[in-house]
């Protein structure tokens, strides 16, 4: 799409913070209750649940601030910064990652039809990857056609990632996976594989 590294950096940092927020909250006992993340103790195991919740909350808020500051400082075109901030909040919110997590948590132990599983994946992983791809395009000044192509790519990549993650949860060893194998089934999560 073009663009300069100085333009990409605040966008990449904002997206990574949002992703980290989602992982911290996802590991909490009230969500997936995972004690391990990438082979290391999860945030709430190291710092306690309250601090993990607050760290996640802070990381959910910082991306908008980073993008706004990049627009104010001229690192990103101000209108592009507004568009990225709107997209960031849409993809993180009830129509994106948080909405997908609601579907996930509200349906533990229930057999879900394929279309609901795919919608959940689209809203969780797909929304984050769509944000990555489209925000980069917007920051670089790419047109609507490239943004649409990036969005379509992100959707397919998100679905592929989630299906691979489901397969690994059943077939991988704990060392490779970085968390206990079979944790989805153990917690009553219905996945594409199950």
For the regions a language model picked out, list residue spans one by one.
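All-alpha prenyltransferase/terpene-synthase fold signal
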Residues: 1-194
